[in-house]
Design a protein with these regions (language model features):
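A domain-level signal for the structural core that forms small-molecule/cofactor-binding pockets
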Residues: 2-58
Length: 58
């Protein structure tokens, strides 16, 4: 059973819903499994807790 953990800046629920639907379709197709076997968790991380290129984002 695939488990996808996505950490990202906070996004609206509509965005997470669309991502979950599309990612589930892709995983199901390529792994030849039914949609209910794909798990996705979204973890919102505030910008001030991210660093990219050595610079804090918040």
């Amino acid at each position: 059973m695939p488990f996808i953990h996505i950490r990202m800046f906070p996004r609206p629920q509509e965005v997470k819903k669309a991502l979950a639907e599309e990612l589930t379709k892709i995983i199901s197709k390529h792994c030849k499994i039914t949609d209910d076997h794909t798990w996705i968790v979204f973890e919102d991380v505030q910008k001030e807790h991210w660093s990219m290129g050595g610079k804090l984002q918040g």
